[in-house]
Amino acid sequence: MQQSLLTFEQVYYTYPGTQQSVLNGITLQIPQGKRCALIGRNGCGKTTLFSLANGLYKPQQGRVYWQEKALQYDRKNLMQLRQKVGLVFQNPEQQLVASTVEEDISYGLCNLGLPIADIQQRVTQALVEFELTELAERPVHHLSLGQKKRVSLADVMVLRPELLLLDEPTAYLDRPQSRNLMAMLNKIYKSGTTILMASHDLDLVYCWSDWVFVMDAGRLILEGKPEDIFSQREILDSIELGLPPIYEIFITEELATKEHNSENFRRRILQFFC
């Protein structure tokens, strides 16, 4: 049986000062060892779900579990949770807190009280892995958006989380920057980290993910393998998501039949687009 890292059980959440719930009894399990994607139109509750997963918010009803243990919201347990569950915001400005790149990456480690030698070793390794060595002493406000996103990713990964949450990681990046970031995410995944990524880029979701969650109005309405999710055209159209253009190509019979082997055709298209 597939083990889940993080489980939401009948979770409700309403922001203070509002009456409408953002999450409406959502139940969801994030499977260990998978590249997961979360899709849904704006306002469906994706970002709120991430904030609950990281312990930034606490459910008003329902429970959140880490490896079958209910989350505890005292300071000690939240610090432990945030080492295990890393969260990268869509806007990197929300989590860049120090003066230079090197200082920013070391910030979380210093808060953990690790020995200086360990901090230096981890920071040096992160600078190399995220191609930031030449930027180590540069002020973070002098960086490009793509560089800031890499720093925010390094900030989280230096803590060695088991689960990485990413809110629209490729938003506002050009194609080369997106490819570079996705290559880094693939390395992170291959090193053993489970990933859950929220994205409006349905082509990326179809190409990259092993498992897809579909949210609408604060609820989970579909989950499954990408090919199974995107076969549900009627449901996806009803919530204004539609299908990935690349998937539309795959299901166009006229194109598929031009290849003797439709699987070879699929691989060629994936290589071109992804």
Swiss-Prot record:
Q: Which Pfam families match?
A: ABC_tran
Where it sits in the cell: the answer is: Cell inner membrane
Which residues does UniProt assign to the signal peptide?
A: none
Q: Which GO terms describe its biological process?
A: cobalt ion transport
Concerning CDD domains, the annotation shows: ABC_cobalt_CbiO_domain1 (cd03225)
Q: Which UniProt keywords apply?
A: ATP-binding, Cell inner membrane, Cell membrane, Membrane, Nucleotide-binding, Translocase, Transport
ABC transporter domain residues are 6-242
- Please give the PANTHER family that the UniProt record associates with this protein: ENERGY-COUPLING FACTOR TRANSPORTER ATP-BINDING PROTEIN ECFA1 (PTHR43553:SF24), HEAVY METAL TRANSPORTER (PTHR43553)
Family affiliation: Belongs to the ABC transporter superfamily.
NCBIfam families, per the entry? cbiO
Give the protein's recorded name. Answer: Putative ABC transporter ATP-binding protein alr3946
Q: Name the species this protein comes from.
A: Nostoc sp. (strain PCC 7120 / SAG 25.82 / UTEX 2576)
